[in-house]
């Protein structure tokens, strides 16, 4: 196989052009076989194969800087930069990350996990290159979905005005960006890219730059040429922002892409190359339903059928209950930021299209729009992943909390998310949400509690409310408890919230078998806090443990311990959480065990503290 011969960039360059199609087929076969065993982002990587091969044939990413937007389409890049032999560890703890990681390879220029930032990052690198007098190239590879985020346009606006040489490759696999303006447009676009034309253009620019008269002549003729071209073709948004636009072009034509990349380098200015690709290309199941293969678990590569048994998730229950509420209340509406399927809102969108709003990758806008809806008497819920809601923090404070508007946040993927790693773990929402004045925060531990909390947030709250819940299914705790104390005892007090209760109950059972009688307090809301129950329990047991699936910074335990001290309640206090760093990728159970938050580790900690 050709793929087996690639151990360096030179090996890739040595492959004859007429065999590159065969190589791309082998890459796709490798991706399907490996991702079927580990899970991962498949469809987007199948669609970017030829583009990635072309990039690595033109540029040396050990010195040139390739910045990914989002980053989940980096698998082919990793294969071509010496990491094929580690793909059996993809997204596993201690294994290959599913996103770019500079600590993993010199070829990974920048960590990427969130969207729409690549142009800004690339501009910073291009400016650094100019400041240090270096000569490396800077590229940003972004999908068309990233253009739904406003940050991308901030980057384009500044980069175009800067005139810093940089290349943005736009991988367009679905969204129409440039209108089709017919045969003249195609002919002129192709003519502008012919080598003889480009050589003449560069010669003319260099020649006229040698004198003041020449520079004035170039400026005049350039204006005349641009006026004529735009009169015929019109302009793209990117050209209006200062980029030279090349395309659209077939993103599966390697020779064509290579020619465009070399052209972009020669132009020595901000250039956008518009590539049209097919998501899931080369694998029939992914071509048929690319959404299902965007991020997928283990599957049968022959049929494309998932090996994962489908069970209801917190996201599913949220979407179902919200739909029931919307059926009887016409003011209920839902907003999501490009995560309709992930947040469980597919059916809601189908049943209530006039009350469902997918705003794209624009979390700040989502929260602001929710504020406007609430101000006019609607009941909006913004369903956003914990890690992405971070991007809307200013809007939570300024546009929602300041006016105490009744906006409900459905904060999905809280706590350990798993294989997507540190860019996606939901470990900071407890800290940043509790800082928002007037924000009521629910943390349901079961589906039943989620349903009740959703109704409470809509009909018993008057200001902002957040309901935080994890990815996946509920655990052994499946009831709904209105009281904070769910198990009475006297040996010690264990305080927890959310699905952390499952490990706590298991640990408490082991403790009880060993002769201890722990009291368990499960907080239904973490803001406000049920202080009276906590105070009474601490006075009784005089030993308090707080276990949380959140960052140590701004954790609930610190506030609880400070409260007990301030109120003169003597108690030995002990906490355990996810710590102060970032949590890498891996299976959730393995990551929780590594953090000491599984039942066995909690049992050991409590027995040591109480002995």
Predicted regions and their residues:
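N-terminal amphipathic, basic-rich helices that act as targeting or association modules
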Residues: 1-80, 237-259, 267, 271-277
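Extended, hydrophobic alpha-helical segments in both membrane/secreted and soluble proteins
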Residues: 138, 142-155, 344, 356, ...
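Catalytic cores of secreted or luminal carbohydrate-active enzymes
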Residues: 442, 457-459
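Surface-exposed loop/turn segments flanking beta-strands in extracellular/periplasmic regions
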Residues: 294-303
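Thiamine diphosphate
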Residues: 89-121, 131-135, 161-292, 305-350, ...
């Amino acid at each position: 196989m050709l793929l087996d011969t690639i151990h360096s960039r030179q090996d890739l360059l040595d492959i004859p052009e007429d065999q590159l199609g065969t190589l791309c087929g082998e890459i796709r076969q490798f991706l399907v076989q490996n991702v079927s065993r580990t899970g991962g982002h498949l469809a987007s990587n199948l669609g970017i194969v030829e583009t990635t091969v072309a990039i690595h044939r033109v540029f040396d990413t050990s010195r040139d800087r390739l910045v990914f937007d989002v980053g989940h389409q980096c698998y082919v890049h990793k294969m071509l930069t010496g990491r094929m032999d580690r793909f059996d560890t993809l997204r596993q703890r201690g294994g290959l990350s599913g996103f770019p990681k500079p600590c993993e390879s010199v070829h990974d220029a920048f960590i990427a996990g969130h969207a729409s930032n690549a142009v800004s990052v690339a501009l910073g690198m291009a400016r650094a290159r100019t400041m240090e007098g270096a000569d490396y190239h800077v590229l940003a590879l972004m999908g068309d979905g990233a253009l739904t985020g406003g940050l991308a346009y901030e980057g384009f606006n500044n980069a175009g005005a800067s005139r810093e040489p940089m290349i943005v490759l736009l991988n367009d696999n679905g969204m129409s960006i440039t209108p089709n303006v017919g045969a003249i447009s195609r002919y002129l676009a192709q003519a502008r890219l012919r080598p003889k034309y480009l050589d003449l253009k560069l010669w003319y620019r260099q020649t006229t730059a040698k004198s003041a008269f020449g520079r004035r002549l170039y400026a005049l003729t350039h204006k005349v040429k641009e006026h004529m071209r735009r009169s015929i073709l019109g302009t793209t948004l990117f050209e209006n922002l200062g980029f030279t636009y090349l395309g659209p072009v077939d993103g599966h034509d390697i020779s064509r892409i290579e020619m465009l990349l070399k052209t972009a380098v020669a132009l020595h200015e901000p250039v956008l190359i518009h590539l049209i690709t097919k998501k899931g290309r080369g694998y029939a199941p992914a071509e048929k339903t690319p959404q299902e293969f965007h991020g997928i678990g283990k599957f049968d590569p022959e049929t494309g059928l998932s090996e994962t048994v489908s069970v209801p998730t917190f996201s599913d229950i949220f979407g179902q209950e919200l739909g029931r509420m919307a059926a009887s209340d016409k003011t209920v509406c839902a907003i999501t930021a490009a995560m309709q399927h992930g947040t469980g809102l597919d059916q809601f969108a189908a049943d209530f299209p006039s009350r469902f709003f997918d705003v794209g990758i624009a979390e700040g806008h989502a929260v602001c729009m929710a504020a406007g809806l609430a101000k006019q008497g609607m009941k909006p819920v913004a369903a956003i992943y914990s890690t992405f809601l971070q991007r809307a923090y200013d809007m939570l404070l300024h546009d929602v909390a300041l006016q105490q508007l009744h906006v409900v946040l459905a904060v999905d993927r809280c706590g350990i998310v798993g294989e997507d790693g540190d860019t996606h773990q939901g470990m900071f929402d407890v800290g940043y949400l509790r800082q928002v004045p007037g924000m009521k925060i629910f943390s349901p531990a079961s589906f039943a509690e989620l349903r009740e909390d959703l109704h409470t947030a809509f009909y018993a709250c008057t200001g902002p409310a957040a309901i935080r819940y994890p990815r996946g299914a509920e655990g052994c705790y499946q009831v709904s408890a209105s009281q904070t104390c769910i198990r009475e005892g006297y040996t010690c007090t264990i305080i927890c919230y959310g699905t952390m209760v499952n490990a706590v109950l298991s640990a408490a059972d082991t403790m009880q078998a060993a002769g201890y009688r722990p009291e368990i307090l499960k907080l239904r809301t973490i803001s406000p806090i049920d202080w009276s129950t906590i105070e009474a329990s601490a006075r009784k047991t005089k030993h308090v443990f707080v276990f949380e699936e959140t960052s140590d910074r701004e954790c609930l335990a610190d506030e609880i311990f400070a409260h007990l001290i301030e109120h003169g309640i003597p108690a030995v206090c002990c906490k355990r959480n996810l710590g102060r760093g970032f949590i890498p990728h891996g299976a959730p159970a393995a990551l929780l065990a590594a953090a000491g938050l599984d039942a066995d580790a909690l049992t050991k900690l409590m027995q040591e503290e109480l002995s």
